[in-house]
Amino acid sequence: MQFLASNTNLRTDGYGGDATRRARFVIETLEALVDAIGAGRVGFRICPGNPFNDVYDPDPIDSTRTLLEAVRGLRCAYLHVIAAPDRSLDAFALARRHHDTALIINDGFEPATARDAIVALRGDAVSFGRHYVSNPDLVERIAGGHPLAAFDRRTLYTPGAKGYTDYPNWQPNS
Protein backbone atom coordinates (compact mmCIF):
# COMPACT_ATOMS: atom_id res chain seq x y z
CA MET A 1 0.00 0.00 0.00
CA GLN A 2 2.76 2.45 0.90
CA PHE A 3 4.57 1.86 -2.39
CA LEU A 4 1.41 2.50 -4.43
CA ALA A 5 0.32 5.67 -2.62
CA SER A 6 1.77 8.89 -3.97
CA ASN A 7 1.68 10.58 -0.56
CA THR A 8 4.03 8.01 1.02
CA ASN A 9 6.09 6.83 -1.93
CA LEU A 10 8.31 9.85 -2.36
CA ARG A 11 11.16 7.93 -3.97
CA THR A 12 13.04 9.55 -6.83
CA ASP A 13 14.41 6.34 -8.35
CA GLY A 14 12.67 3.78 -10.58
CA TYR A 15 10.25 2.85 -7.79
CA GLY A 16 8.72 6.30 -7.27
CA GLY A 17 7.01 8.97 -9.29
CA ASP A 18 4.12 8.11 -11.59
CA ALA A 19 1.70 5.20 -11.06
CA THR A 20 3.75 2.83 -13.24
CA ARG A 21 6.93 3.36 -11.26
CA ARG A 22 5.11 3.22 -7.91
CA ALA A 23 3.63 -0.15 -8.93
CA ARG A 24 7.02 -1.54 -9.95
CA PHE A 25 7.84 -3.09 -6.55
CA VAL A 26 4.52 -4.97 -6.46
CA ILE A 27 4.89 -6.06 -10.08
CA GLU A 28 8.43 -7.35 -9.56
CA THR A 29 7.40 -9.16 -6.37
CA LEU A 30 4.50 -10.90 -8.11
CA GLU A 31 6.73 -11.81 -11.07
CA ALA A 32 9.30 -13.35 -8.72
CA LEU A 33 6.63 -15.34 -6.89
CA VAL A 34 5.11 -16.63 -10.13
CA ASP A 35 8.58 -17.62 -11.37
CA ALA A 36 9.39 -19.39 -8.09
CA ILE A 37 6.18 -21.29 -7.34
CA GLY A 38 3.87 -20.89 -10.34
CA ALA A 39 0.95 -18.59 -11.04
CA GLY A 40 -1.57 -21.10 -9.73
CA ARG A 41 -0.16 -20.64 -6.24
CA VAL A 42 -0.02 -16.86 -6.22
CA GLY A 43 -2.83 -14.49 -5.34
CA PHE A 44 -2.75 -10.90 -4.23
CA ARG A 45 -4.94 -8.47 -2.36
CA ILE A 46 -5.59 -4.80 -3.01
CA CYS A 47 -7.65 -2.19 -1.24
CA PRO A 48 -8.03 0.75 -3.65
CA GLY A 49 -9.22 3.94 -2.03
CA ASN A 50 -8.83 2.60 1.51
CA PRO A 51 -6.78 4.97 3.63
CA PHE A 52 -4.77 3.61 6.53
CA ASN A 53 -3.29 5.98 9.07
CA ASP A 54 -1.70 8.69 6.91
CA VAL A 55 -1.45 6.51 3.79
CA TYR A 56 -3.93 7.39 1.05
CA ASP A 57 -3.91 7.63 -2.71
CA PRO A 58 -5.43 10.76 -4.25
CA ASP A 59 -5.97 8.86 -7.54
CA PRO A 60 -6.74 5.24 -6.65
CA ILE A 61 -8.37 4.54 -10.02
CA ASP A 62 -5.19 5.32 -11.95
CA SER A 63 -2.95 3.48 -9.49
CA THR A 64 -5.18 0.39 -9.44
CA ARG A 65 -5.73 0.29 -13.19
CA THR A 66 -1.99 0.66 -13.80
CA LEU A 67 -1.11 -2.17 -11.41
CA LEU A 68 -3.81 -4.56 -12.61
CA GLU A 69 -3.06 -4.08 -16.28
CA ALA A 70 0.66 -4.59 -15.62
CA VAL A 71 0.17 -7.93 -13.85
CA ARG A 72 -2.74 -9.24 -15.92
CA GLY A 73 -0.45 -11.42 -18.03
CA LEU A 74 0.97 -13.19 -14.97
CA ARG A 75 -2.27 -15.19 -14.64
CA CYS A 76 -2.18 -15.25 -10.84
CA ALA A 77 -4.63 -17.63 -9.19
CA TYR A 78 -6.80 -14.88 -7.76
CA LEU A 79 -7.21 -11.21 -6.97
CA HIS A 80 -8.72 -10.30 -3.59
CA VAL A 81 -10.29 -6.82 -3.49
CA ILE A 82 -11.49 -4.87 -0.47
CA ALA A 83 -14.30 -2.41 -1.19
CA ALA A 84 -13.52 1.28 -1.02
CA PRO A 85 -15.17 3.29 1.76
CA ASP A 86 -15.97 5.98 -0.83
CA ARG A 87 -18.80 4.33 -2.75
CA SER A 88 -18.10 6.47 -5.82
CA LEU A 89 -15.08 4.18 -6.35
CA ASP A 90 -16.40 0.77 -7.36
CA ALA A 91 -13.29 -1.29 -6.62
CA PHE A 92 -14.94 -4.53 -7.74
CA ALA A 93 -15.95 -3.18 -11.16
CA LEU A 94 -12.50 -1.65 -11.55
CA ALA A 95 -10.94 -5.04 -10.85
CA ARG A 96 -13.30 -6.80 -13.30
CA ARG A 97 -12.44 -4.30 -16.06
CA HIS A 98 -8.68 -4.45 -15.67
CA HIS A 99 -7.93 -7.98 -14.50
CA ASP A 100 -9.21 -11.36 -15.61
CA THR A 101 -8.48 -13.88 -12.89
CA ALA A 102 -10.71 -15.25 -10.13
CA LEU A 103 -12.03 -12.32 -8.11
CA ILE A 104 -12.58 -12.58 -4.36
CA ILE A 105 -14.43 -9.59 -2.92
CA ASN A 106 -14.81 -8.26 0.61
CA ASP A 107 -17.26 -5.58 1.69
CA GLY A 108 -18.27 -6.45 5.24
CA PHE A 109 -20.80 -8.87 3.78
CA GLU A 110 -23.62 -10.53 5.65
CA PRO A 111 -24.68 -13.92 4.23
CA ALA A 112 -27.57 -12.43 2.22
CA THR A 113 -25.53 -9.58 0.75
CA ALA A 114 -22.71 -12.01 -0.07
CA ARG A 115 -25.16 -14.20 -1.97
CA ASP A 116 -26.54 -11.16 -3.80
CA ALA A 117 -23.02 -10.07 -4.82
CA ILE A 118 -22.24 -13.49 -6.28
CA VAL A 119 -25.57 -13.69 -8.12
CA ALA A 120 -24.90 -10.21 -9.57
CA LEU A 121 -21.44 -11.43 -10.70
CA ARG A 122 -19.67 -8.75 -8.64
CA GLY A 123 -17.10 -11.40 -7.73
CA ASP A 124 -16.42 -15.10 -8.03
CA ALA A 125 -16.22 -15.57 -4.26
CA VAL A 126 -16.64 -13.45 -1.16
CA SER A 127 -14.51 -13.31 1.96
CA PHE A 128 -15.60 -12.64 5.49
CA GLY A 129 -12.94 -10.92 7.59
CA ARG A 130 -14.41 -9.31 10.67
CA HIS A 131 -17.31 -11.75 10.84
CA TYR A 132 -14.85 -14.62 10.66
CA VAL A 133 -13.07 -13.24 13.74
CA SER A 134 -16.29 -12.89 15.75
CA ASN A 135 -17.85 -16.16 14.61
CA PRO A 136 -15.55 -19.14 15.14
CA ASP A 137 -18.30 -21.29 13.65
CA LEU A 138 -18.99 -18.97 10.70
CA VAL A 139 -19.57 -21.72 8.15
CA GLU A 140 -22.03 -23.54 10.39
CA ARG A 141 -23.87 -20.30 11.20
CA ILE A 142 -24.26 -19.41 7.54
CA ALA A 143 -25.26 -22.94 6.53
CA GLY A 144 -27.77 -23.13 9.37
CA GLY A 145 -29.20 -19.66 8.81
CA HIS A 146 -28.14 -18.61 12.31
CA PRO A 147 -27.43 -14.97 13.17
CA LEU A 148 -23.85 -13.72 13.13
CA ALA A 149 -22.25 -12.36 16.29
CA ALA A 150 -21.23 -8.72 16.07
CA PHE A 151 -17.52 -8.02 16.20
CA ASP A 152 -16.00 -5.62 18.70
CA ARG A 153 -14.22 -2.99 16.60
CA ARG A 154 -12.14 -1.91 19.62
CA THR A 155 -10.35 -5.27 19.64
CA LEU A 156 -9.48 -5.41 15.93
CA TYR A 157 -5.77 -5.05 15.16
CA THR A 158 -4.79 -5.13 18.81
CA PRO A 159 -2.34 -7.39 20.64
CA GLY A 160 -3.55 -10.23 22.80
CA ALA A 161 -6.30 -12.80 22.55
CA LYS A 162 -9.28 -10.59 23.48
CA GLY A 163 -11.54 -10.24 20.50
CA TYR A 164 -9.80 -13.04 18.62
CA THR A 165 -10.27 -16.21 20.64
CA ASP A 166 -13.06 -15.40 23.07
CA TYR A 167 -16.17 -15.34 20.86
CA PRO A 168 -18.49 -18.28 21.62
CA ASN A 169 -20.02 -20.67 19.12
CA TRP A 170 -23.69 -20.15 18.31
CA GLN A 171 -26.15 -21.70 20.75
CA PRO A 172 -29.93 -21.89 20.33
CA ASN A 173 -31.61 -19.17 22.39
CA SER A 174 -28.36 -17.23 22.72
Question: Which residue ranges define each predicted feature?
Answer:
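Flavin-dependent oxidoreductase catalytic cores
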Residues: 1-174
